[in-house]
Regions:
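N-terminal accessory interaction module
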Residues: 32-50
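A short, charged/proline- and glycine-enriched loop
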Residues: 54-56
Length: 224
C-alpha cells in the first residue's frame, strides 16, 4: 500500500479516534452543554461570515447533506473555522424514513463522531436531535446527554399530516428520554408545542429570506 494512499484514505476517521461508544451500535457520547446563542446561520454561510462576526453567530446543519458531507471526509480542515463560532450544532445527516436502517444508524454515528471530535478540540457543541420512525427510538437518542440544551428542526415535516404526526411522536419521545432544558427550534413550531416554556424558536432561512425581500421591496417603494 503506497504512502500517498495511506494519507488520503480516511478509514471512516477511525485512524483519528475510536471513541468508547454507548448503546448497541457504539455511538460516541457527547458532553452536555448549554448554549446562549440567538443568531444561527447554516454551514453553507459559515465560511463567508467575517471572522470578527463569528463569535456572535452559531452554526446549524439544517441544509442538504451534500453541502456538509466534506466535514466527514476532511474533519480537520474545518476545525479552525468552526472554532470561531459561539456554538456549533452536530451535523444533521439525513434520517429519512425510506432510508435503509443501516444508513440511518451510520448517519447517527457520523453525527456523534464529529460532535465529539469537535468537543475534543474545544468547540462548544450542541446536539442536533433527529429521529425517523418509532423503531428508531431504540438507538437515535444514544450518545445524547440528558438535561441540557438541544436543537431540532421541523422544516419539511408540517405540511403532510403523516409527517407531522411522526415529528410529534419523536419529539415527545425526545422529551421523555432526554428531558432537555432548552429546545432551540428551527422552523415552524407546532401548535401543541408553542406553550412549552423551554422552546426557543429560530426562524428558518426561508422565513428570514421573505422578511429581507419584503424589507427591500418596502424600501424601494419609499424611494419612489
Amino acid at each position: 500500500m503506497s504512502e500517498s494512499y495511506r494519507q488520503t484514505r480516511n478509514y471512516e476517521n477511525l485512524n483519528r479516534c475510536i471513541y468508547p461508544g454507548v448503546g448497541e451500535f457504539g455511538i460516541p457520547e457527547l458532553e452536555p452543554v448549554h448554549c446562549d446563542a440567538e443568531t444561527w446561520i447554516g454551514f453553507n454561510y459559515a465560511k463567508g461570515c467575517d471572522v470578527e462576526d463569528r463569535p456572535a453567530h452559531s452554526v446549524h446543519f439544517f441544509i442538504d447533506d451534500y453541502q456538509f458531507n466534506r466535514l466527514w471526509t476532511a474533519p480537520d480542515v474545518y476545525l479552525p473555522m468552526l472554532s470561531g463560532f459561539r456554538c456549533v450544532a452536530t451535523p444533521d445527516f439525513s434520517m429519512y424514513t425510506d432510508f435503509p436502517k443501516a444508513i440511518q444508524i451510520y448517519n447517527h454515528y457520523r453525527k456523534h463522531w464529529l460532535g465529539r471530535y469537535w468537543q475534543d478540540h474545544g468547540i462548544t457543541v450542541i446536539q442536533t436531535i433527529a429521529w425517523s420512525t418509532p423503531d428508531s427510538y431504540e438507538w437515535c437518542f444514544d450518545g445524547e446527554p440528558v438535561g441540557c440544551d438541544v436543537i431540532v428542526s421541523s422544516v419539511g415535516t408540517q405540511a403532510d399530516p403523516e409527517c407531522a404526526e411522526l415529528f410529534m411522536s419523536g419529539y415527545l419521545e425526545m422529551e421523555r428520554r432526554l428531558e432537555p432544558s432548552k429546545v432551540i427550534f428551527y422552523g415552524d413550531v407546532p401548535d401543541a408545542l408553542k406553550w412549552r416554556s423551554n422552546v426557543c424558536p429560530v426562524p428558518a432561512f426561508q422565513h428570514e429570506l421573505k422578511k429581507r425581500i419584503a424589507a427591500k421591496q418596502k424600501a424601494a417603494k419609499e424611494k419612489v
